[in-house]
Amino acid sequence: MRKLNAVIFAVLAVVFILPVVATVLLSFEHGLQGYSDLLFDCFVFYPMFWNSVIYAVVITLVQLVVIIPCAFGFSQARFRGKGALFVFYIVLMMMPLQVTILPNYIGLRDMGLIDHQLGIILPMVFSPFGVVVMHQYMKNIDNSVIEATRLETNSIIRVMITSVIPQLRVCIFAVVLFVFADCWNMVEQPMLFLKNEELKTLSVFITNAQNYTGEVLFPAAVMFLIPVLLLYLFFNDSLEKGLTLGDLS
């Protein structure tokens, strides 16, 4: 059985890794000329790359500010309807983007945020995924530390900052990786909510493949992969620990 599982996982690994390897190899089809054209002659690359960085970093940081208090409330607070509200969060997490993107567009249009950076950031701030994951992880934290801090202060914010967040470092790293990757890979939002090319992201650059030659496109795809791969390499241990502890709960 173990050998069968090993074979299955090996096949799946090859299926997932093969497109990445093919992209890297194709990026060197013309030697370094494609990278040279991309980095020195393609003037839209740098603005779109930094737009992707800014959107992903800002959304990730703001999501953490929202996620941690929400997850703390679900795990520690007692109020009527908490279970139903948490189920609602899970339903929202499973809801596909295509269901919510039109209401988001209408709301942003009415607020005058179409073709504005906030039109990308605001709809991504309130993500139920991080709340659900961090709530599961909070079931494993040491409540004795929280109770000891509550004896010293009545401030729930201080309790959260001094007693809860230090125990969430592993989970925070895991959530950061997932949220950053999700924001980095977003395509529909910048394509629909932004008209100004100077505000669009690198994912849009790659999606509009018909506008560029293969010499530039494949190197751009490799550059697009690098930030998420680096994050995974740095936070791999924290990601595995976070997923394991969340699964055990």
Label every model-predicted segment.
Residues 2-249:
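A structural signal for multi-pass alpha-helical bundles of membrane permease subunits
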